[in-house]
Structures are given as C-alpha cells and as structure tokens.
C-alpha cells in the first residue's frame, strides 16, 4: 500500500494551503509550476513548510479535512512544532461507533 502524506504550503502572502498526496516532492513541483491546485496559481513564491505521513487515503482525507478546520494560529503551531499532529491522527484512527 502506498503511504499518503499531509502537507502545508505557505504562499507569498503568508496563507497556508493544506493538501494530501502520495508523493510530496512531485506534488510540490506541480504547485510550483502552476499545474497543481487552482487555489495556489498566481500566489507568488510557494514554500513547503510541513509534511507528514498519515497512512492510507481515507485517513489522509480525514486529516486534511480536520487540519483545514484549524485556525491560522493552530496551523502555525503545527508548522512550527508539529503541535497536536500525533493526537489528531490518533483521534482519526479511533473507530467510530455507529448506532442504529
């Protein structure tokens, strides 16, 4: 199984973009060349500031959603310290209990 990664890219105007991929370097190069996400096109210099393996695609999608819900301050802490990332992944791996 190919591992998936969560990554954050900082734009020239100091915004943070969150994405997932199986190959961080390839995806970063796509963003740099303007062939990645439309949200990053024309945003000036892009800097890869965080990446971490998250497991399979399902877990990566859930992690991406959760990180996108964080405040800018929380994302900055994640970039600077990895703060809370292990806990975030752990909470996503806990099986959900379904009630009928």
Swiss-Prot record:
Record-linked Gene3D superfamilies? GIY-YIG endonuclease
Q: Which SUPFAM superfamilies match?
A: GIY-YIG endonuclease
Q: Which GO annotations describe the biological process of this protein?
A: DNA damage response
| Record-linked InterPro entries | GIY-YIG_endonuc, GIY-YIG_endonuc_sf, UPF0213_domain, UPF0213_GIY-YIG_endonuc
Cited Pfam families: GIY-YIG (PF01541)
GIY-YIG domain: which residues? 2-77
Q: One MF term from GO for this chain? A: DNA endonuclease activity
Which PROSITE patterns does the entry link to?
GIY_YIG (PS50164)
UniProt superkingdom: Bacteria
Family membership, please give it.
Belongs to the UPF0213 family.
What this protein is called in its record is: UPF0213 protein YhbQ
**What organism does the UniProt record list as the source?**
Escherichia coli (strain K12)
Organism lineage string: Bacteria, Pseudomonadati, Pseudomonadota, Gammaproteobacteria, Enterobacterales
């Amino acid at each position: 199984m190919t591992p998936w990664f969560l990554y954050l890219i900082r734009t020239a105007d100091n915004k943070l973009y969150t994405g997932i991929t199986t190959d961080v370097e390839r995806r970063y190069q796509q963003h740099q060349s303007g062939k990645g996400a439309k949200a990053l096109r024309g945003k000036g210099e892009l800097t890869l500031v965080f990446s971490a393996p998250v497991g399979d695609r399902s877990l990566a999608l859930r992690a991406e959603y959760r990180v996108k819900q964080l405040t800018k301050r929380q994302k900055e802490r994640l970039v600077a310290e990895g703060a809370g990332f292990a806990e975030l992944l752990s909470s996503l791996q806990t099986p959900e209990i379904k009630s009928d």
